[in-house]
Amino acid sequence: VLSPRENETLTFLALGYSRAQVAHTLCISENTLRVYIESARYKLGAANTTHAVSLAVSRGLILL
């Protein structure tokens, strides 16, 4: 259900990257990154970013 970019974003966050590192790695602004995170949170019904990462991992949406 996650877009490829939302998936990449949550994967990097799960691996311990900071938001700045994720944005740099994906060649996007931190504002754009925030939009991807918020969209993923909404789709997953997560309360925060950590919860979104946890849900994505537990549902098998991202592999570590």
Predicted feature residues:
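A cross-family signal for key residues in well-ordered alpha-helices
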Residues: 11, 24, 54
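Recognition helix of helix-turn-helix DNA-binding domains
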Residues: 18-51
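Regulatory hinge/linker segments at domain boundaries
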Residues: 1-8, 12
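Short helix-to-turn junction characteristic of helix-turn-helix DNA-binding domains
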Residues: 13-17, 56
